[in-house]
């Protein structure tokens, strides 16, 4: 039971917080501050009960799992701080349901990360999915938000059905739902077990959907555009990191070097994601839609590391998604500080000439964009270099060249953001009050992007 303590603790924090938010009205900000502090303490709790290495009833624990969960929880706390300060900035009542949904979503991610059984993994991912649909449609009076959430729900439900169908194939042809049993079947079967492969591919469709990779990416631009910007920070950072860790677990524990799945399927998805993400963003005017295509592109890069199936490849994939998540949070936080209520409608027009009166925000956004391009000595360069270097070492030249090519294409729209801020005609923007939570997040982002490569190299 102690192994489940991080999950139980977060669930209790979410439910008790919601309970007190209902019975003590008009105190949501105070309650949210207490919840954020409790979540910070939960990070240490997650470390404490991850010292035991092993598997208990399909639920694994260990140091690496504890670190993974702590990283996801840290980015979740940042998303909660962003929502809290955003509600203050736009003078809107803080809806505690947002924090409850995010925490329950993280519980699902925690379960998925520790799962060593397909059915348990499915349950964890579904808890994350159901709460994500609600987060996407959190702006109740906004048509675009409702439209995006409905698309997300319909497509997500379809993919969940495919995933469950895949589990039935896995059990039927593999005789078990345990990861180690399926790995044994794949490695010791004299012929190709087509039914088992179909089952695994169908199950993987759910993970690729949540990662926003091609061809299960169609929901991403509409959902990002319609969702509240605080929800988008969660989707881009904590949620994506969690799903990448789940995919890495499956790659290490099941797929391995099994050629038909690992090489053919994931390689094609990686290439298509890079190409579609790079070229799809070129004509976008909405900054949230641009970041949606950027997410698709960067998930393609992450899949390169997954495909390599070695420790260095996995490290490169995890490091890259962390760098991208930090940059994305910095970008969205700057939009909130700059535009306030209009951050959800951010476009190239809304940031024209802001460098004249908002030098600090323009500088932070520029650093984020340069890091995403991969300009040295920023951390984004280190992440891309490490990823492509590992691909070339494994003689995956097509993936490396495709990654470099799409990085050059993506530089066009990243630099377009910088151009709009520094070289376009100035528009008047109402100066908003500085909030210390958002300011601290941005300084941490800049520090990581500027100095992260030096820290990581040691």
UniProtKB/Swiss-Prot annotation:
NDH-1 is composed of 14 different subunits. Subunits NuoA, H, J, K, L, M, N constitute the membrane sector of the complex. It is a multi-pass membrane protein. Its main location: membrane. PANTHER family: NADH DEHYDROGENASE (PTHR22773). NDH-1 shuttles electrons from NADH, via FMN and iron-sulfur (Fe-S) centers, to quinones in the respiratory chain. The immediate electron acceptor for the enzyme in this species is believed to be ubiquinone. Couples the redox reaction to proton translocation (for every two electrons transferred, four hydrogen ions are translocated across the cytoplasmic membrane), and thus conserves the redox energy in a proton gradient. GO terms for molecular function: NADH dehydrogenase (ubiquinone) activity; NADH:ubiquinone reductase (non-electrogenic) activity; quinone binding. This is NADH-quinone oxidoreductase subunit N. It catalyses: a quinone + NADH + 5 H(+)(in) = a quinol + NAD(+) + 4 H(+)(out). GO terms for cellular component: plasma membrane. NCBIfam families: NDH_I_N, PRK05777.2-5. Its EC number is 7.1.1.-. Belongs to the complex I subunit 2 family. It is an enzyme of class 7 (translocase). Keywords: Cell inner membrane, Cell membrane, Membrane, NAD, Quinone, Translocase, Transmembrane, Transmembrane helix, Transport, Ubiquinone. The gene is nuoN. It is found in: Cell inner membrane. The keyword Ribosomal protein does not apply. The chain crosses the membrane at residues 4-24, 30-50, 62-82, 94-114, 118-138, 153-173, 194-214, 235-255, 261-281, 290-310, 318-338, 361-381, 397-417, 438-458. InterPro entries: NADH-Q_OxRdtase_suN/2, ND/Mrp_TM. GO terms for biological process: ATP synthesis coupled electron transport.
């Amino acid at each position: 039971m102690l192994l489940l303590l991080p999950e139980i603790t977060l669930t209790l924090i979410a439910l008790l917080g919601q309970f007190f938010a209902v019975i003590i009205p008009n105190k949501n900000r105070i309650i949210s501050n207490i919840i954020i502090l409790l979540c910070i303490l939960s990070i240490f709790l997650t470390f404490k009960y991850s010292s035991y290495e092993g598997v208990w009833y399909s639920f694994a624990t260990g140091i690496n799992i504890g670190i993974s969960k702590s990283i996801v929880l840290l980015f979740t706390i940042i998303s909660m701080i962003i929502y809290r300060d955003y509600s203050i900035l736009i003078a809107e009542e803080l809806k505690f349901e947002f924090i409850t949904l995010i925490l329950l979503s993280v519980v699902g991610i925690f379960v998925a990360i520790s799962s060593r059984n397909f059915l348990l993994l499915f349950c964890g991912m579904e808890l994350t999915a159901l709460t994500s649909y609600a987060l996407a449609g959190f702006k109740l009076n906004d048509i675009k938000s409702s439209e995006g959430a409905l698309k997300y729900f319909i497509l997500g439900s379809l993919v969940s059905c495919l995933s469950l169908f895949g589990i039935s194939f896995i059990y039927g042809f593999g005789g078990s739902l345990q990861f180690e049993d399926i790995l044994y079947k794949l490695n010791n079967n004299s012929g190709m077990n087509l039914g088992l492969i179909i089952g695994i591919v169908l199950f993987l469709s759910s993970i690729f959907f949540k990662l926003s990779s091609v061809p299960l990416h169609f929901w991403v631009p509409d959902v990002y555009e319609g969702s509240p910007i605080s929800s988008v920070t969660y989707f881009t950072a904590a949620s994506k990191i969690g799903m990448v860790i789940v995919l890495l677990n499956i790659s290490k524990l099941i797929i391995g070097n099994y050629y038909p799945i690992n090489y053919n399927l994931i390689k094609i998805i990686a290439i298509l994601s890079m190409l579609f993400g790079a070229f799809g963003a070129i004509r976008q005017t909405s900054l949230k839609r641009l970041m949606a295509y950027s997410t698709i592109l960067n998930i393609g890069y992450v899949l390169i590391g997954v495909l390599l199936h070695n420790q260095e490849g996995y490290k490169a994939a995890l490091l890259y998604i962390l760098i991208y998540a930090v940059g994305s949070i910095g970008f969205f936080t700057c939009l909130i500080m700059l535009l306030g209520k209009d951050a959800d409608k951010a476009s190239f027009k809304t940031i024209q000439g802001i460098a004249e009166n908002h030098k600090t925000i323009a500088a932070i956004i520029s650093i984020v964009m340069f890091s995403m391009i991969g300009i040295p000595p920023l951390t984004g360069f280190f992440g891309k270099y490490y990823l492509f270097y590992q691909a070339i070492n494994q003689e995956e030249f097509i993936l490396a060249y495709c990654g470099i090519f799409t990085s050059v294409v993506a530089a066009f729209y990243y630099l377009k953001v910088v151009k709009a801020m520094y070289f376009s005609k100035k528009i008047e923007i109402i100066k908003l009050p500085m909030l210390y939570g958002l300011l601290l997040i941005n300084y941490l982002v800049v520090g990581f992007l500027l100095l992260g490569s030096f820290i990581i190299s040691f």
